[in-house]
């Protein structure tokens, strides 16, 4: 489907009362193409709202705004990433943003930047994929990022990044 808007639906209300949050007509400055789907993302522990322009391309263009702007007539989206940043996933925690990126590392890095002054060029690398273990997915679980690493896309291991301490642990799970 082309030219899809992103809407806010309140459970228990009719779909006809859904509010259009972002679309090519409400936000022409975002240059949302007909084939791009504007998808909203929120994280419980972050005061920010994110909007990604998604297509079949893995790398996503992202924008962000304070969650409080959801109550306004129009959200003032600020640019965050472009497809050339090679970002495939994000996790927000407080004012920090963690990004899964293949830029500069075909085995992926997890980057960290502060959303009060985001700076991807100088983002901290908190976890590096290696030629043996590629970072394949990241998930948020309370105060941790679960990092799925794959070896030849056949063997999967997990590491855990503690969002409070910044420490990575990789427990060995023995299968008998």
What are these regions (language model features)?
Residues 1-176:
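Peripheral, non-catalytic segments that deliver or gate enzyme domains
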């Amino acid at each position: 489907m082309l030219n899809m808007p992103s809407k806010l639906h309140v459970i228990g209300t009719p779909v006809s009362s859904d509010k259009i949050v972002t679309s090519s007509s409400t936000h022409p400055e975002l240059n949302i193409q007909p084939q791009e789907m504007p998808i909203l993302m929120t994280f419980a522990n972050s005061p920010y709202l994110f909007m990604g322009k998604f297509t079949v391309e893995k790398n996503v263009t992202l924008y962000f705004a304070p969650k409080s702007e959801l109550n306004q007539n129009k959200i003032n989206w600020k640019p965050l990433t472009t497809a050339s940043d090679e970002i495939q996933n994000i996790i927000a925690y407080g004012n920090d943003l963690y990004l899964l990126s293949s830029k500069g590392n075909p085995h992926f890095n997890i980057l960290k930047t502060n959303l009060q002054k985001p700076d991807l060029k100088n983002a901290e690398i908190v976890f590096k994929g290696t030629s043996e273990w590629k970072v394949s997915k990241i998930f948020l679980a309370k105060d941790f990022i679960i990092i799925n690493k794959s070896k030849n896309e056949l063997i999967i291991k997990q590491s855990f990044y503690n969002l409070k301490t910044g420490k990575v642990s990789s427990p060995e799970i023995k299968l008998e």
